């Protein structure tokens, strides 16, 4: 319905433009159609008159009246308009148009909620990107679910989406994995070596070492004893593949897939870092220099060495950034620069990264580098994911023996379910820390949000099954012949208005990259349905009212199903 209101107001604006009431060069930015919280203010409210009043040299309320007078009649959408406050125009939608929402939902079925705000724009969503050095933890899981659901929402809103996992297979952390596995490998042959400080604890390292021994026997033993801090790349590749197998299994449990797995090592081996630096050099964005000590670091503890620096401050960053150290090695940031240039060179028009909150300090520098490399601002958006606190019985959940320092994602999924994990990880905005109650996540009561929403879907299925059992001739496929005019009570209007809101929620979640808007909406819709069900009879009423209400709740079921599908959560027929 919002689109219909926008079209009506656009017609009125064009009429006043043609009459010269609104100047031809009027700036239309800032005009918003909103849904008033107070029902007495109508179904929609628009601020056009207040935005254009000064440009039209009129009082806002006077311009509002001219706009109302210029609205086309006979559209069957608006029953009346009211001018309120300083110049808002409030629209009251006709009952017929409201009932038409139910038909629209059922006609469009699984496509209801889809839009085209993305207009086919090519978007790359990079998420998870956990180091291949150990099992995934719940923080990784929250980022995985957020990225996957955001990708689904963007697709629903008309974007052409690709999903990518950046495999950090060339950094310091994989070097630590190599040393950790090599020590455990030696222990399996009876060498009395201790796990050095800084190496990875946890039984999973022993599992990798055992698999390595089974595969290669003592092939690496001589090398390991001769060079305790060294390891062959072949051995490291094997260790990373073992971890990657676990990571892919964890993602499969959550039904998360990727279109691309991009190797950081390839940036080095294929000369992509040198290419990125050459592009920056050609644009005059590099220089040899010495950085000042970071804030809070004493100057005497800071080694000032000449490095190759990027003029990040010219592109909105706080300080210039090092790309190549004085010893000739590249910084981690250099690989980030090369990777993001590669994304742009692949033709993506918008980049979205899902990062842990601890990477927040990297956002501005990567955005600055992309701006310098491409000449485009706002190419990269970053969604930061805060921590997850696990509790059971009101107490924090202790660390995993297998991981050594944290609870693995696999353990959480096995203790609850994929549905629970996916819904709960989106039960708060990504910028807020999340408390995940493992007991509540499996509870079959209304305090468990995923159960509450799924139960609404299952309850509607049960009502329809009962109707069929009692001989009601109405079929789900035959709803179009049902007279919806009996719908008109307050709770029915509330449900219909919430159904109409769903496409706007999807669009807002896509534009603002806030996937948690979907579960928030579903909880609200489920609450409205449960309230309606508890206060209204559906079966034990006259046939006309019964059939209209059956069709109404069928539309509710469809929208709940569409929302749960966006979340990657099942839509059970019974519970």
From Swiss-Prot:
The keyword Protein biosynthesis applies. It catalyses: tRNA(Arg) + L-arginine + ATP = L-arginyl-tRNA(Arg) + AMP + diphosphate. GO terms for molecular function: arginine-tRNA ligase activity; ATP binding. Its EC number is 6.1.1.19. It is an enzyme of class 6 (ligase). The keyword Aminoacyl-tRNA synthetase applies. It comes from the Bacteria. Keywords: Aminoacyl-tRNA synthetase, ATP-binding, Cytoplasm, Ligase, Nucleotide-binding, Protein biosynthesis. GO terms for cellular component: cytoplasm. It is found in: Cytoplasm. Belongs to the class-I aminoacyl-tRNA synthetase family. NCBIfam families: argS (TIGR00456). HAMAP family: Arg_tRNA_synth. This is Arginine--tRNA ligase. It comes from Magnetococcus marinus (strain ATCC BAA-1437 / JCM 17883 / MC-1). The gene is argS.
